[in-house]
Structure formats: structure tokens, C-alpha cells
Amino acid sequence: MQENGDYITTWGDSLTAGGGWNSRLAELAGMTLYNGGTGGENARTIVARQGADMMTINNIVIPSDIQPVTIATRSSDGGIKTEWGYTVTPLLQGGAHVNPCKIGNILGTLKWTGANYADMTGIWTFTRKETGEQVKIDRPTAIRTDFDMNRNSPYLMVIFIGQNGGYNDLDDLVRQHKMMIEHASAKHTIILGLSSGSASSRKSYEDRMKQEFGRYFISLREYLAHPIYGTDGKTIVSCYGLADQGLEPGSKEYNGVTYNALDEIATGTVPHQILQDSVHYTTGTKDVIGTMLYKKCCELNIF
């Protein structure tokens, strides 16, 4: 078992891979960050990379020389199978934290050969790092990623999954979070709540996550869209996400639609004004999130 290190590991999709909030958190905590985010990935693929539902391979021969062997094809297999029987698609948008990886005790590189994430002709291959004896894999065998083997015992693990789907229902999503917590040897864990959607559309999700994880679940939507009222105590004049950046509520056009920040705040929706698009954060918003998370961690006696 790995010993806990003075570092932070964050797991997620493009909202994590894009960094900013996690690097700000690590900076304030005085710790090294290991960013386990990859764009476009759903919850199941992230859980597989982390190792909680590990990717597996069977019925292949790893040659003695340094030659790639096919692990799975996009067209016929759909992706790589996991221990729990799901199909996942790692590396479609990169992911340096996957390699070097191991199949059994053979160290090598897992590669996606497609021209882009949508290339249905792409395949996943494994190439051993050094020559050695030919190995026949005739039992289900784990594919262990670099971060699974080496960055799964952090002082703090942050899990931020679900924006791209990859779960059947809330029970399934909760189970995946708990699997990640159980698999890692993190001293502390924070669960980030999705920032997209409105208060009404996210109510069931947020209520369930709070029930399961308590104060260690932090809803980014709730914080960023939290209303600030005027002197009458009734009129919405701003929200935390705007005020923390010193911004006044305004409007923003996106895809031909104009969004009014105060109208969005009234529904518990993060204003487009502090987003790059409809989901991803501006640089200022990333800083707000990282600073807020550090303060929340201090309140939880993590830092």
C-alpha cells in the first residue's frame, strides 16, 4: 500500500483537466497537484482510470519484443471492458496520467490510435517498455494506470464526475463515488457537485449527495449561483460567483441567445457571464472555485 503523500489528486473530465481551480487549491495548501482530469470522459471511464473499476484484458499475447498488441477496437468492442462489465473509452482526448501502465507485471504504454475522439477506426494498443519473455494472458488481468499505482494515496483526493453522464441513476453515481473512495488510500476526500443546471433540476442529485457525503460534498452550482440580496432582503443584486470576482451582473450572448445574469441567478443557475461557454469556467471563476475549496477544507480541518 502506498503511504500518504503531501499532494492533492483530482479526478474528473475537462472541468478538472482544464485546471485553474485545482492548481489554485494546491497553491493555497502548499501542496503538489496531480491532475487526473481528461476531457470528454464520463463517470465510468474516470472510475476505471482511477482503478476502482479497473480496466481488464484477456486472451491476448504480449510479444517479447517492443511491438504494439491490440487491446480493443472502437468499431467492434466499443472500448475496453472493466471488471464490473462496463465498457470505457480512455485516452480519446489525451491523459498523460494513464502511462506508463501495467498489464500484470509488464510495464508499457496504452495508446489510442484514432485521429480524434470520434474516430471509429481507432484502436487501443499496449506496447511493452522493454523486451522480455512473451506473456500469454488467458485470465482477466487488470490494466493499472500510472496514477492508480502512484497517485492514489494523496493527502486530499477531489472527485468531480458526472457532467458527461456514465451512470444509470443516482444510486449508481453514489456507488461509483464510494468505489473510488474505497479504492484510494486518500487521507481526505472532497466530492464536487456539478455546476450546470438549475436549483430545481439539480435538487434530487444534490439532496442525495448531501445525504451520502455530508459536508464533504460541495455543490459548485450552489456556491457560484448563491444569490446576494439587496437591502430589502428580497431583491437579488448579485451572486457569489460574480461578487467574488468583483463583477457586476450583466448579460452575455452565447450561441445566439442572450442570457441575463440576474434572471439566471433567480433560478439557481450559474450565470453565463462567468463561464467560457455553457459549462466551462473562465479564469476568474476557476480562481474563485479554488479559493472557496481551500476555505471549505480549512473549515473541515483538512488544512
Name each model-derived stretch.
Residues 30-47:
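A short beta-strand-loop structural module common to alpha/beta enzyme folds
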Residues 12, 37-40, 162, 285:
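Glycine-centered flexibility sites
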Residues 5-21, 39-43, 106:
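Catalytic nucleophile-elbow at a beta strand-turn-alpha helix junction centered on a G-D-S/GDSL motif
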Residues 22-28, 47, 51-68, 74-303:
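Alpha-helical cap/lid subdomain in secreted, periplasmic
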